[in-house]
Amino acid sequence: MKRLLFIAAAVIAIASPAAYAQVVRGDQIIAQSNFVNRQQAAIPQISIVVRADFVLFSVRYETATRSADARENELAQTFTTVTQRAARTQDITVEVGQPGVSAAIETAAIKELIQARGDDRSGIDIVLKVMVKSNETFDAVRARAEKFVKDAPLTGRVEAIIGDSQFLGVSEPKKHRETLIKAISEDVRLMQASFGGPASPVQVSLTGMEQRAQTRPVGPLDLEIYIPYSMSLRSGAGQ
């Protein structure tokens, strides 16, 4: 009998300087899709909205079998089943850990992944990375994740628990940064043309351009990406 539970999981996230739950890795940017922040964050004028390339779901497998050795065996067998199933499933991959602090399954031994939860429960955390298909809705993406978890056979008393927090992600953030820089450059030229002239040139100064691109969710599968820069104008030719 399949045991699939949906609960409010504890959120493990990294807050970005812009006050949104965000994780930046070299090859991707991840933002928590249902993160709510009461603080007002200043968003620069220039930004772009892109569709998420993937969604991350946290899944916890737990067992309450009496024997600790039996619990470890159940979780090890379940983990093998899940990872092998993911290898055969298109557009779904598995990592160990939590969104933003996950790693490839090859980087850790199963004994290192199993965590004791009290005296009579043990568990293991994984991350499902589900690629977003063309014209797919968020509900459709989540349905695929839920089906993957539901259809994976479980060993012994293992239960599957899907967290209620998801992370939207974009791959290759470098290409989006290049798009932003070009747009900001055009905005600088517009400022100079609008407020200056041959007799009174305008100097435009930018600060913060060295920072990494930031994101915030603006739709079920949409992310706004921006560089947290600031702009200042000064009239006169260096005066």
Language model: regions and residue ranges:
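N-terminal signal peptide c-region/cleavage motif recognized by signal peptidases
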Residues: 14-18
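Short, charged, surface-exposed interaction patches
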Residues: 22-189, 197-239
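Generic short amphipathic/hydrophobic targeting helices enriched at N-termini
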Residues: 7, 19-20
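Sec-dependent N-terminal signal peptides
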Residues: 4-13
